[in-house]
C-alpha cells in the first residue's frame, strides 16, 4: 500500500490540481474510509496517512471543518466505544499543528473540543500509548487559554488510573506540568481532591509512582499552596507521610518521606501535630490489610447485587468487563505483610 500512498501524496501536493476537483473527491465518505485506515498496526503506513491528511487539511481550506468533524468523531468512537485505536497518536500530532494555528481568544467550538476530546481521551485504557502527543495538545490549548488548566486537572483527577502504574506515573508528570499555570482564583476548589490524590500516590506500592508523587514537594508553587491552605493540606498529607516515614520498606523512599515530614512540620507545627490525631484524616490510605479486605469485599458484594438486579431487569444485558481480576490483584496497601497476594503464571 505504501506506493499507493506515495502516489496520493504526489497528487495532493501537485500544484496543477484544481481545488474544485479535490472538493469533489474529498467527501465525507472518503474521509470516513480514509480515517479507518489509521487502524493499521504498521507504523510507517500510519505515518504516510498522517502526512497525507495533514497536507489535505493545509491545502483544502473548504473541507477543514469537515476534516475536524470527522477526526473528532473518530476520537469520540475511541472514548466511548473502543478500547484501542492504533492511529490515535498520529491524529493527535495533526491536531497539535491545528491547535497551534488557533486564534486567541479560543472559539467556543475549540473549548468544547478540549473538554470533550482532549480531556476525555485521558480515560481511555490505552491512553499510555499516545500520552506524549496528548500532553502536547493539552499544553498547547492551555498556552492559548490558561483557564483551561483547571478543567484539565479536574479531568485528570476524575479519570485517574487505579490499576496501571505506568499510566499513573504519566498522569503525575502531566499534573506536575500543569500545576504552575493553575488559575489562582479557582485553585481552592481543587485542593481537597488534589491533596488526596497525591497522598494516595505517595502510599502507592509501586516505587516509581511514590517517587514521582514526592517530586511535588520540590515544586515551590505546590509548597506555597500547602502553606496557604495548610488547614486543608496537612490533615490529608501529614498522617500518611508520617506513617510511611516510620514504616516504609524502601530505604531511599523512607529517607525522602522523613524529609517531607519535616517540611510539613516546619510549615506549622501545631497544625501538623493536631493533624496526626484528627479523626477526619484520610484513614483509608493507611488501614491494615484486614480492614482493606473487608471494605473491598463489601464493595464487590454491592456490585454483585447491582449486576444481578440489572440482569433481572434487562435479560441479556452486556456488562462491562473490568480491567483486572482477583488473580492479578497484588496489593491494597504499602507493605510486604499482605496475606492476600495471589501469584499466577
Residue ranges and their predicted role:
Residues 20, 46, 64-68, 83, ...:
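Structured alpha-helical bundle/scaffold domains in large eukaryotic membrane-trafficking regulators
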Residues 200-201, 234-345:
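Eukaryotic acidic, Ser/Thr-rich intrinsically disordered low-complexity regions
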Residues 41-42, 84, 127, 163-164, ...:
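Short inter-helical turns and helix N-cap capping residues of alpha-solenoid HEAT/ARM repeat scaffolds
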Residues 21-82:
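Long, hydrophobic, well-ordered secondary-structure blocks that form the structural core
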Residues 22-32, 64-72, 88-91, 106-118, ...:
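Core helices of alpha-solenoid repeat scaffolds
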Residues 4-15, 34-37, 52-61, 74-79, ...:
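Hydrophobic residues within the alpha-helices of tandem HEAT/HEAT-like
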Residues 1, 15-17, 30:
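Internal amphipathic alpha-helical repeat/solenoid segments
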Amino acid at each position: 500500500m505504501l506506493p499507493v500512498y506515495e502516489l496520493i501524496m504526489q497528487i495532493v501536493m501537485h500544484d496543477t490540481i484544481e481545488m474544485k476537483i479535490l472538493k469533489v473527491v474529498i467527501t465525507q465518505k472518503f474521509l470516513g474510509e480514509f480515517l479507518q485506515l489509521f487502524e493499521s498496526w504498521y507504523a510507517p503506513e500510519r505515518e504516510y496517512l498522517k502526512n497525507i491528511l495533514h497536507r489535505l487539511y493545509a491545502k483544502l481550506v473548504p473541507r477543514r471543518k469537515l476534516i475536524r468533524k470527522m477526526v473528532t468523531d473518530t476520537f469520540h468512537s475511541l472514548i466511548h466505544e473502543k478500547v484501542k485505536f492504533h492511529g490515535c497518536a498520529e491524529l493527535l500530532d495533526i491536531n497539535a499543528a491545528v491547535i497551534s494555528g488557533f486564534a486567541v481568544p479560543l472559539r467556543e467550538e475549540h473549548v468544547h473540543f478540549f473538554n470533550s476530546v482532549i480531556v476525555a481521551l485521558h480515560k481511555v485504557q490505552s491512553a499510555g500509548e499516545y500520552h506524549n502527543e496528548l500532553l502536547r495538545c493539552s499544553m498547547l490549548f492551555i498556552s492559548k487559554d490558561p483557564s483551561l488548566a483547571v478543567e484539565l486537572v479536574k479531568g485528570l483527577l476524575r479519570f485517574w488510573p487505579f490499576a496501571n502504574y505506568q499510566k499513573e506515573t504519566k498522569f503525575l508528570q502531566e499534573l506536575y506540568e500543569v500545576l504552575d499555570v493553575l488559575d489562582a482564583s479557582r485553585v481552592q476548589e481543587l485542593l481537597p481532591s488534589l491533596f488526596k490524590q497525591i497522598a494516595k500516590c505517595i502510599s502507592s506500592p509501586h516505587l516509581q509512582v511514590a517517587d514521582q508523587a514526592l517530586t511535588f514537594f520540590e515544586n515551590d508553587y505546590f509548597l506555597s499552596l500547602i502553606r496557604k491552605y495548610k488547614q486543608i493540606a496537612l490533615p490529608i498529607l501529614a498522617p500518611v507521610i508520617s506513617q510511611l516515614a516510620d514504616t516504609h520498606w524502601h530505604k531511599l523512599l523512607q529517607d525522602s518521606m522523613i524529609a517531607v515530614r519535616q517540611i510539613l512540620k516546619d510549615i506549622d507545627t501545631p497544625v501538623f501535630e493536631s493533624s496526626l490525631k484528627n479523626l477526619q484524616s484520610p484513614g483509608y490510605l493507611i488501614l491494615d490489610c484486614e480492614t482493606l479486605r473487608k471494605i473491598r469485599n463489601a464493595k464487590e458484594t454491592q456490585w454483585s447485587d447491582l449486576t444481578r438486579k440489572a440482569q433481572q431487569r434487562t435479560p441479556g444485558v452486556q456488562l462491562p468487563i473490568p480491567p483486572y481480576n482477583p488473580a492479578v490483584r497484588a496489593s491494597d496497601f504499602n507493605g510486604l505483610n499482605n496475606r492476600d497476594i495471589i501469584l499466577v503464571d
